[in-house]
Amino acid sequence: MFDGIGFMELLLIGVLGLVVLGPERLPVAVRSVTGWIRAMKRMANSVKEELEQELKIEQLHADLKKAESKGLSNLSPELQESIDQLKQAAQSVNRPYQVQDIPAQENQIHNPASQSVSSEASPTASSAPTSEPNQGEDTRSNPKANG
């Protein structure tokens, strides 16, 4: 893990850490440093894997272009079928989003409750009981009536 660092150098770093941080904070510092090292290793491995995957994809594209340049008629039927499937998949990815034609009735939101209520059965403002204000007294102008 530590290329170029010998046992004596590690011992010296440990003693200096013990002197500077003390016995209480040294284990916490070592744990945090090892956590950072693990995170950096994970990040480096993920970048490495992504690059390898991209290189494989590029190699496959190069092989496909090479096969196309040689002529697709010389290929075996299995390879021809797989190339056709790849082309269909590429066309489906490259095609823009297409809206299917749906009749207008299917696009409407149906509300069965509003369809079952007829105009005769629906409550109107004229059939609702009305409450009339007290006639004779104006409560806005009479402060004694308000309080």
Curated annotation (Swiss-Prot):
Transmembrane segments: 2-22
Residue spans of biased composition, Polar residues class: 71-97
NCBIfam families xrefs: tatB (TIGR01410)
Gene3D superfamilies noted in UniProt: 1.20.5.3310
UniProt record similarity statement: Belongs to the TatB family.
UniProt organism field: Shewanella sp. (strain MR-4)
InterPro entries: TatA/B/E, TatB
Protein name listed in UniProt: Sec-independent protein translocase protein TatB
Alphabetized UniProt keyword annotations: Cell inner membrane, Cell membrane, Membrane, Protein transport, Translocation, Transmembrane, Transmembrane helix, Transport
Gene Ontology BP term (one): protein transport by the Tat complex
GO molecular function terms listed in the Swiss-Prot or TrEMBL record: protein transmembrane transporter activity
Membrane topology term: Single-pass membrane protein
Subunit text: The Tat system comprises two distinct complexes: a TatABC complex, containing multiple copies of TatA, TatB and TatC subunits, and a separate TatA complex, containing only TatA subunits. Substrates initially bind to the TatABC complex, which probably triggers association of the separate TatA complex to form the active translocon.
Gene name, Swiss-Prot/TrEMBL: tatB
GO cellular component, as recorded: TAT protein transport complex
Stated role: Part of the twin-arginine translocation (Tat) system that transports large folded proteins containing a characteristic twin-arginine motif in their signal peptide across membranes. Together with TatC, TatB is part of a receptor directly interacting with Tat signal peptides. TatB may form an oligomeric binding site that transiently accommodates folded Tat precursor proteins before their translocation.
UniProt-annotated stretches for the region Disordered: 68-147
Localization terms from the record: Cell inner membrane
Domain of life: Bacteria
PANTHER family the UniProt entry points to: SEC-INDEPENDENT PROTEIN TRANSLOCASE PROTEIN TATA, CHLOROPLASTIC
Biased composition (Low complexity): 112-133
